[in-house]
Amino acid sequence: MKSLKYLLPALAFLVLVGFFYRGLFLDPRTVPSPLIGKPAPVFELEELSNPAETFATSDMLGKPALLNVWATWCVGCRQEHSFLMQLARTGEIDMYGMNLRDERPKALDWLRRLGNPYAKVAFDPDGAGSLDWGVYGSPETFLIDPQGIIVYKHLGPLGPAAWMEEFRPRIAAMQGGAQ
């Protein structure tokens, strides 16, 4: 009985080490979102460039849309920005932004200097609007179908590989197979 008393903590420790070791090899970008297949969370925030106007979930209905959560302090956001500008020029999809935990003048200056790929940008200075979306960092990009259902969530900078492998096939499926 005494040996079992010492063996149980050792076994528990080994199990924890096993879980930790397994976790080292998981890709954090593949964390499934509980929002996939569910309606996009309802929000209504000030529009970044014009606080008298609002940007709401309903603005993204009717066609496939991207919602990109970004910030000026985010290194990954700077990395993906040139790709977002290229994507905006193609007109493949309506793109919207949500500026997260930022200062309005800094965000406006960022878009003025680097270009604005978004049709509208929600200003979320305290992060309250992004909480319902399950955002815990930036950049994060959501693909939303015409009915407002979240189809896919991408963590980290968006680039050509993720666009071609993850987004394009889903958009084609929404459009009946046409690319």
Residue ranges and their predicted role:
Residues 41-44, 70, 96, 131:
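Conserved Rossmann-like nucleotide-binding pocket used by diverse enzymes
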Residues 66-67, 95, 141:
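Hydrophobic beta-strand anchors of alpha/beta hydrolase catalytic cores
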Residues 63-65, 70-73, 137:
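Short pre-active-site segment immediately N-terminal to redox-active cysteine/selenocysteine motifs
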Residues 43-66:
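A short beta-strand-turn-helix
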Residues 78-115, 125-131:
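Structural microenvironment flanking redox-active thiols in thiol-disulfide oxidoreductases
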Residues 6, 112-117, 124-175, 179:
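Thiol/disulfide oxidoreductase modules built on the thioredoxin-like
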